[in-house]
UniProtKB/Swiss-Prot annotation:
It is a peripheral membrane protein. The active site is at S206. GO terms for biological process: phosphatidylethanolamine biosynthetic process. HAMAP family: PS_decarb_PSD_A (MF_00664). This is Phosphatidylserine decarboxylase proenzyme. Is synthesized initially as an inactive proenzyme. Formation of the active enzyme involves a self-maturation process in which the active site pyruvoyl group is generated from an internal serine residue via an autocatalytic post-translational modification. Two non-identical subunits are generated from the proenzyme in this reaction, and the pyruvate is formed at the N-terminus of the alpha chain, which is derived from the carboxyl end of the proenzyme.
């Protein structure tokens, strides 16, 4: 995995470790997937250093990409049965919907929370629960605007099913959008993910849907902002 969250109860570092943590909190590190997008404009800036406008454009683009691919540190809650937001963004939908057919979860609607990621949000996705990965399926599709209701059905997506230690199935779906045309998923079947663990990335925004078992209590509303790995979006039955 790209980066694991700090488990609750972890002792605070001291000395140099404490200083490093302070720097990480002030300046979030870069996700490895963003490295080419930062190095390329830096190279342009270096080659065109004698031309002010080229140098400025290269440095500005590199800074923007570094911001887009930032990977901030997060600390998930330690409450039993909670589901955390799989991404930073804005809650777009809180409803009931049929999970992606490729996950074989049946045709009955399940509670769902959809989070829309803009180009200014953090692009990484984090495991909404701790558990074992049972399915990972990539589905080709269209690239409609991710804020449309039917984007979850027709757009390119990557669906992952996680089984918690209590036997609950939670599905999390990365959905490509109008600008986001590259979905990355590092998790594989059999992997054991801690809650809040980084497992994937959608380049330049998009949407992430989470499907819950029946009886789950949803704790967010449309329009609410979420912080990946920290905002509690639901309580499992």
């Amino acid at each position: 995995m790209a980066r694991r969250p700090t488990p609750p109860g972890t002792p605070q570092p001291t000395g140099i470790g404490h200083i490093v943590d302070l720097v990480r909190h002030a300046i979030p590190p870069l996700h490895p997937a963003g490295l080419p997008f930062v190095l390329a404009p830096l190279g342009v800036a270096a080659l065109g250093r004698n031309r002010k406008w080229v140098r400025r454009a290269g440095l500005t683009t590199a800074a923007a990409c570094a911001t887009f691919f930032r990977h901030p540190h997060r600390v998930p809650p330690n409450r039993i049965g909670v589901v955390v937001a799989p991404a930073d963004g804005e809650v777009a939908l809180v409803d009931n919907a049929v999970p992606p057919a490729e996950l074989n979860l049946g045709s009955e609607p399940r509670p769902r929370v959809s989070i829309f990621l803009s180009v200014l949000d953090v692009h990484v996705q984090r495991s909404p629960v701790g558990g074992t990965v049972k399915e990972v399926v990539h589905q080709a599709g269209k690239f409609l605007s991710a804020d449309l209701a039917d984007a979850s059905e027709v757009n390119e997506r990557n669906s992952m099913l996680i089984e918690t230690a209590d036997g609950h199935d939670v599905a999390v779906v990365q959905i490509a959008g109008l600008l986001a045309r590259r979905i990355v998923c590092y998790a594989g079947v059999g992997d054991v993910l801690p809650i809040g663990d980084t497992y994937g990335l959608i380049r330049f925004g998009s949407r992430v849907d989470t499907y819950f078992p029946a009886g789950t209590t949803l704790l967010v509303e449309p329009g609410q902002r979420t912080i990946g790995a920290e905002t509690v979006i639901a309580q499992l039955p």
